[in-house]
Amino acid sequence: MLRYTRNYRLHNVASSLILKRTAIIPSLQGLRRGNFSQDDTTNLNNKKRRKRKVTSISLDDLNSVNLKKVNTKELEFKVRQLKEFTKNLKAQIKRSESRNEKRETEDDIDLEEINKDADSVFENLSNHERRKNHKVQNHLGIPIGNSQNQSTNLSSLILGSSLEQAQKFLPSTLVTRLNDNNLVLKCLTDKTRQNWNPIIKSISKNREGLNGIGKNKLNSTLLSSVKGLYFDNIERLDKMLLEYVDNDITKFTTEMYLSLFENLSNIKLTDPNMSNEVIVKMKELLERYDEALIKGTDTKMTQYILNNGIKFASKLNNHEHMEYFLTKFKGYGIIPNRINYTTVLQYYIRMGISKKSWDIFDTMKFLSKEHAPDLIAYNSVLTLCSRDKDYSKALDIYNEMVNSGINPGTSTRTIMAKILAIASRDSFTSEGKSESLRLLGWKFIHEIIETTGSKLSHKSLESMIALAAYDGDVGMSRALYHCYVTTKYRNVVQNWVGKRDYVKIWKSVLDPRMLNYLFLAYSNYNSNKLPLLLGYEQGILLRRNIINSVDYSGRSEFDDDLGVLLPFLPVTEIKHNWELLAESRAIWHFNLEYGGSTSLRSTSESIVDKSTIMTAVENSKTIDDFKWNIFSKIHELKSQTINTDVLNSIVLNTYLTIPIKLHDKKEFVLRLKEFTFQQHDFDSKIESFYLESNNKMVEDNDKNSSSPSTSEDTSIELAEDPNDLLAHYILSLKHKILANCSTYELTMKAASKFNDIKLATEAWEERGKFRKSSSFQKLAQNNRMESDTKFAELMVAFFSSQKMYTDALHVVMSSKRYIDWKYPMVKNLHRGLLEIEDSRSIDILLDIVNRKSKVQTIEETISSLTL
């Protein structure tokens, strides 16, 4: 006799408390002894089991479980995590079903019909003897001479099935004209990657084109679905649509305009000339509509059609094209909708036109509810606040968004955290509240983690490392950078198709922004300052979990072939300056060399050698042509051996700032000389070589005419050494960038930090030569003035710190004509003059600082005359 016992216990699966019932079935005595017969087993199976009534479960049965002890927040987080998992699982199932549907359709065989046909064949073959007395039949059991009326063979079933599937995507008329069901199914079955280009091209080859198809059918099955057309196929579609309306433009419908505009606006701009062709085509369509209006068309222009125009103009960053489409709204009497306003808003933000951006945003707020800003619009203006480092306005926008009922998502909180991090960079932008802003930024990060769990986006990681970097939290910054690089490397390698190209892999993995924040953390490190996250419990837990999740030794990374070892010191916390300098140099080289795939020290003589240089000389008519040819060779050299995405002035300046902040003058000078070169130095070497080469070529020609027997030896002797020197110099520039205004400003700051008059003098002289170069002269006038003003201010600050007040005052006096000196710029100089009681110099300085502009003088004169 079987005996059942039941008990209930709590089982935690995927964060849900689930009642789990277990059934305990004791073995029979015979089974335990092992001496049972087959009859005993048969009797056991045939014996009717006694049913036991199972009562329903109520909350009273759970007395042994204290549910109140469950953390409510943790339970809510687990529920949200389970919902997110369910959502992702549904998406995966949907994608899998789409792929399965594609495979089944591409087989062009209806399995159900095939089974029916196979059953028919089997029945005919098995009854072969019975069918002998009937009239002659073929091998499928189908009477010869009457096959179409009696049954359907396998080929007709396949064709019928593919025809039925093709008619799901196109009108039956078009399917018949195409006469290629396989093409239709191949191009349109996968709805996520439909390719309409072969379809439109094939339809255009038919004389009938789109004629004979009802308007409703045309709109629902073709015009509303066709997407991703190339420009030539858009032209074909437009031509067929004109033929469809018998070239009567008054019958050209709204759906036709919308389909053409949508495909035009989504064209990928691989060729610069293509953008002009697209704009011309859009204007041509609008001119066609204007002409149709004059003729009395009933077709209505819509906001959605014109939105494609402003979207494409926004993509081009072209103000003239944008204004053209905006005036069309007024011309047609169309009020822009929310989508139109948002597109224009994003365009102005991208172009850096802050005033117009805020005007558009305010207009959206004070129009109807249909025009009220949505989440996209709010996120767009928050990026504008980030650019302006205006954290107070960003907080106002965020609170306004919450009060209007819009739920700020992960992207919004990420932007807010980034804004607060950037605003905390110094006491001026943070208004003396740097730590408070970072603390508020971490609050947004905690909200993101509570919502999404441990799965953080790239933008969220960037905001986190920005907060840690400005706080000088090296331990957190290193861990975040390590997590980002290793995770992205694994994802890229796992999805890589074909033979692995590690240069391309690392180019997509290494992010210069993340590297810049890591270097910023190194430069802001202060051993006497406690990281902000260690000041409260939630921050301590977050920091500990992230740092402990990283294995700097790399042992856990090589469980498979996807592991990568970054050049970090095998410690969780760095405490010494020399460790920061060594690790920053290693990370910098690792990024420049594509993770070790290339080498800074390798020579690329195949790109630059003697013959290459002489060819450049012979092909250059002027010195400028020769410079251009050499620059192109340097660019080619860099692109093949160095990660040029990382080698830029922003990251390099942050890299150079590290030894300045850590008081290591020798390391700064080494880094400066190793990774920068001077424009005037490059010009002098190139010009002297070019002139010398031309002179030698002339001399060689003269010697060839006088003594041809010795001309060859002389030519080799003269051309050897200069070529070698220039080739080595060019090769040394492959990992260097041209020193610019910010480089000289940083050098002057270093001179002030190290109290080095020689370094300051060199920076002053080098920048004086740089001002005469073409690189500086090509800058806009306001940029040149801004750079001159900043460098002069740094010079005054340096001389004042060295108590060289006469030199500092001389800088102010010599530049007063083109620099508008303000008191904060010369405050230290004024204080120094007060200490030595130099009243004459004080009067001169204050006279320059307090002088009025010509406009102010004229205005005061006019006001005095009026009085």
UniProtKB/Swiss-Prot annotation:
GO terms for molecular function: rRNA binding. Disulfide bonds: none annotated. Its main location: mitochondrion. GO terms for cellular component: mitochondrion. InterPro entries: Pentatricopeptide_rpt, TPR-like_helical_dom_sf. Residues 1-96 form a transit peptide. Keywords: Mitochondrion, mRNA processing, mRNA splicing, Repeat, Transit peptide. Pfam families: PPR_2. PPR repeats lie at residues 337-371, 374-408. It is found in: Mitochondrion. One of its GO terms (biological process) is positive regulation of rRNA processing. Regulates mitochondrial small subunit maturation by controlling 15S rRNA 5'-end processing. Localizes to the 5' precursor of the 15S rRNA in a position that is subsequently occupied by mS47 in the mature yeast mtSSU. Uses structure and sequence-specific RNA recognition, binding to a single-stranded region of the precursor and specifically recognizing bases -6 to -1. The exchange of Ccm1 for mS47 is coupled to the irreversible removal of precursor rRNA that is accompanied by conformational changes of the mitoribosomal proteins uS5m and mS26. Belongs to the CCM1 family. Involved in mitochondrial-nuclear incompatibility, a major determinant in reproductive isolation between species, through hybrid incompatibility of Ccm1 and its interacting partner 15S rRNA between yeast species. Binds to mitochondrial small subunit 15S rRNA. This is Mitochondrial 15S rRNA processing factor CCM1. The gene is CCM1.
